[in-house]
């Protein structure tokens, strides 16, 4: 993602001053996601969903993370797909952080990528005003993308891939880093401004704005759907977590929790298969996002 150097340096200076206060290190990834985390909050279960979707296409899938930043999410994926690569259009961040660039992250725009098919492309963030979806759809058999429900990505908030010939298979909802940031700030960093009653009230209003969409080309839709469905059965007994997931729980974003103030009533991390996607038992999981369309017809 492109950065204004002066703004980046100013942000990094603020980050350094904050680090000097010795806060909870897990707070940093949600307060300064550019330097410590990602622009989307995730759990280990998200990493495993992504990797199992990729492996449903091939036992040794080709995988590319587009706009991977310094590779926070990509590193987690590489634990399961060792040949996964990333592409980043701006290496300024590596210089600012004084971090060596891994050899599996490549510099340049995605349009300069050697146009050969990849099994799975992950798009965790698309800079406002930038739109590379057409190219991604042309090279990837499966696209997994995350974006803020407010449409703060691409051109005119366009983050979907149906218009480029891909079929949406499923989606799930998680908090954005901003959602978590708000809860952390209210709880830990504005104590003099908020009474306990006020903090409790604000917590009851918390919402969740990040969506994960799974797309595929038609020829791969069945295996992607089946791979995701089969993996979900394993989640029922899964106990593995990243250490930083404790912050999500602490802020009220538990796995499968339903937020009372949210416009959408599906539980967090609940996989919803699209209206035209059958579960293996023949049932439908209809997306709540489709209801308004049905009503209009």
Question: Each predicted region: which residue ranges?
Answer:
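S-adenosyl-L-methionine
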Residues: 1-57, 273, 282-292, 296
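Short amphipathic alpha-helix with an adjacent loop that forms part of the alpha/beta core around
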Residues: 54, 108-116
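C-terminal substrate-binding/active-site "lid" region of AdoMet-derived donor-dependent transferases
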Residues: 129-219
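Short, polar loop motifs at secondary-structure junctions
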Residues: 69-71, 88-93, 127-128, 148-151
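Rossmann-like AdoMet/SAM-dependent catalytic core
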Residues: 183-297
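Conserved class I S-adenosyl-L-methionine
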Residues: 60-69
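A short SAM/SAH-binding and catalytic strip from SAM-dependent methyltransferases
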Residues: 119-131
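Class I SAM-dependent methyltransferase SAM/SAH-binding core
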Residues: 72-109
């Amino acid at each position: 993602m492109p950065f204004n150097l002066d703004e980046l340096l100013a942000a990094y200076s603020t980050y350094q001053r904050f680090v000097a206060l010795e806060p909870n290190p897990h707070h940093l990834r949600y307060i300064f996601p550019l330097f410590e985390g990602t622009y989307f909050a995730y759990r280990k279960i998200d990493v495993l969903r992504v990797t199992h979707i990729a492996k449903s296409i091939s036992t040794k899938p080709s995988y590319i993370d587009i706009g991977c930043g310094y590779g926070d999410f990509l590193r987690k994926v590489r634990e399961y797909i060792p040949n996964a690569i990333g592409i980043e259009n701006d290496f300024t961040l590596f210089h600012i952080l004084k971090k060596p660039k891994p050899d599996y992250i490549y510099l340049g725009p995605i349009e300069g990528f050697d146009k050969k098919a990849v099994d799975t492309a992950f798009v965790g963030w698309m800079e406002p005003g930038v739109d590379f979806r057409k190219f991604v759809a042309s090279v990837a058999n499966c696209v997994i993308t995350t974006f803020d429900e407010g449409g703060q990505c691409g051109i005119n908030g366009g983050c979907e891939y149906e218009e480029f010939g891909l079929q949406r298979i499923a989606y799930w909802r998680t908090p954005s880093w901003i959602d978590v940031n708000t809860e952390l700030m209210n709880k830990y960093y504005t104590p003099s401004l908020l009474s306990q009653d006020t903090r409790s009230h604000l917590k009851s209003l918390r919402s969740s704005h990040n969506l994960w969409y799974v797309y595929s080309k038609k020829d791969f839709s069945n295996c992607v759907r089946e791979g995701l469905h089969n993996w979900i059965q394993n989640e029922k007994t899964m106990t593995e977590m990243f250490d930083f997931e404790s912050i999500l729980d602490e802020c009220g974003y538990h796995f499968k929790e339903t937020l009372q103030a949210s416009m959408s009533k599906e539980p967090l991390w609940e996989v919803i298969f699209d209206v035209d996607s059958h579960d293996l038992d023949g049932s439908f999981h209809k997306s709540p996002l489709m209801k308004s369309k049905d009503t209009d017809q």
